[in-house]
């Protein structure tokens, strides 16, 4: 799995509200979350399909 899949979700400190998806290693599932628009980390995907394709085993 890519490094992004090992990271915990991080929404970031900014004030935008962007729908995104993150991977939960413990559950081996992708979930929706609201990204703030800055910082965060690589565990952020535009679609649930992209998240699943990248991380779910």
From Swiss-Prot:
One family name in Pfam for this protein: Kunitz_BPTI
Effect of residue 27 to S: In Mambaquaretin-8
Membrane spanning stretches: none
Keyword Disulfide bond recorded: yes
Tissue expr: Expressed by the venom gland.
Record has Ligase as a keyword: no
Xref: SMART domains: KU (SM00131)
SUPFAM superfamilies noted in UniProt: BPTI-like
Keywords noted in UniProt: Disulfide bond, G-protein coupled receptor impairing toxin, Secreted, Toxin
Domain BPTI/Kunitz inhibitor: 5-55
Major localization listed first in the record, in broad terms: secreted
Entry GO MF terms: serine-type endopeptidase inhibitor activity; toxin activity
GO CC aspect terms: extracellular space
Further details from the record: Negative results: mambaquaretin-7 is a weak trypsin inhibitor.
Function: The mixture of mambaquaretin-7 and mambaquaretin-8 interacts with vasopressin V2 receptor (V2R/AVPR2), probably in a selective manner. This mixture inhibits vasopressin binding human V2R in the nanomolar range (Ki=3.14 nM), and also potently inhibits vasopressin-induced cAMP production (IC(50)=58 nM). In vivo, intraperitoneal injection of this protein into rats increases diuresis, without any loss of electrolytes.
Membership in a protein family: Belongs to the venom Kunitz-type family.
Record's comment describing the protein's domains: Exploits its two major loops and engages more positions in its interaction with V2R. The pharmacophore defined by numerous amino acids positioned in loop 1 (9 to 18) and loop 2 (34, 39 and 44) may be at the origin of the absolute selectivity of this protein for V2R.
Protein name: Mambaquaretin-7
Organism field: Dendroaspis polylepis polylepis (Black mamba)
High-level lineage: Eukaryota, Metazoa, Chordata, Craniata, Vertebrata
